[in-house]
Curated annotation (Swiss-Prot):
Catalyzes the specific cleavage of pyrophosphate. Its EC number is 3.6.1.1. Changing D19H: Loss of activity. The gene is PS2. Substrate binds at D30, D105. It comes from Arabidopsis thaliana. This is Inorganic pyrophosphatase 1.
């Protein structure tokens, strides 16, 4: 499911794509809700029996059956740990004119609740995640982004869960951006599911893997498979420094390219002008007037 907002502040050539769990927030949002509401034992008991996305839908039913309300889930989400420099980093990237998107294997309900609480929901032009909604009984329903019960997604990377291939989402984003003109992408993530989209990035793009997390380990096995420039980060503070530094670097390079193009065009115009001035022209004289002879 993709959510689109009217965030149209992007006035540069950069799209920043964030993972959510352990990237924007410091923990896994699914585990946080389950643990904080006291359902860890049941979760661990059921985990070997079904896919993660299916299990989360089952756990939301269990929460409802045990009397847990949607408001209680929201309250837990509002206390989720986040590094104090992450929100300023996101705001700075937006203020610098970047288009911001989220691609996450969490769910829409969790993400929207958290970004709204943080006051940054309007900064993202699109959120791609597993659908999450409250049904008529007051139960939070979570379904897969890709319905793997009907058909598998076409990814053969081997690191993507059955319900979501982030690489396919990035390819769709790239296709839409191509219609708008050339754009550079910065992708931030931490998990194994962030490896496939990292492989899809182009040479002018940047990938920011969280160091010593699964995506970093996968990239480190063979960095030559990654066409994009690799800029690792460790926590919210280093994320802010590296992200904003990369944005400024891209903007500086684009300004240099514009100045160079402008200078080349000026040189061409001067050459044309000089060439015209050096062409020999015969003087153009006015036609003589006939003067009548008076007798």
């Amino acid at each position: 499911m993709a959510y689109n907002s009217n965030s149209n502040n992007n006035n540069n050539n950069i799209v920043v794509v964030f993972d959510f769990d352990k990237t924007i927030i410091d923990v896994d949002s699914d585990n946080w809700v389950i643990d904080e509401l006291g359902f860890t034992d049941l979760f661990n008991q059921l985990l070997p029996t079904m896919p993660w996305n299916t299990l989360m839908d089952r756990m939301m039913k269990e929460l409802h059956d045990q009397g847990k309300t949607i408001e209680e889930i929201k309250q837990v989400l509002r206390t989720i740990p986040i590094h104090p420099r992450v929100v300023p980093a996101i705001k700075s990237a937006h203020d610098l004119g970047c288009e911001l998107r989220i691609v996450s294997d969490a769910n829409m309900f969790f993400i929207e609740t958290i970004v709204e609480h943080l006051g940054i929901s309007e900064l993202f032009s699109e959120i791609n995640s597993n659908p999450g909604y409250v049904d008529e009984r007051g139960t939070l329903k979570i379904s897969p982004y890709h319905d793997f019960t009907k058909s598998p997604h076409s990814c053969s990377c081997g690191t993507c869960p059955p319900n979501m291939c982030k690489g396919l989402i990035i390819e769709r984003i790239q296709q839409s951006l191509a219609k708008e003109g050339k754009k550079k992408m910065i992708y931030l993530g931490d998990g194994a599911g962030d490896y496939c989209p990292s492989l899809k990035l182009n040479t002018e793009d940047y990938v920011m893997p969280r160091k010593n997390f699964p995506v970093w380990d996968l990239i480190s096995q063979n960095p030559m498979l990654i066409k994009a420039a690799i800029r690792e980060w460790t926590d919210g503070q280093s994320m802010e420094m590296i992200l904003i530094g990369t944005i400024e670097e891209i903007r500086l390079e684009e300004e240099k390219e514009k100045m160079l193009t402008s200078a080349e065009n000026n040189c061409k115009m001067q050459t044309i002008s000089i060439g015209i001035n050096n062409v020999h022209h015969e003087p153009i004289l006015p036609r003589a007037l006939r003067v009548s002879q008076s007798s």
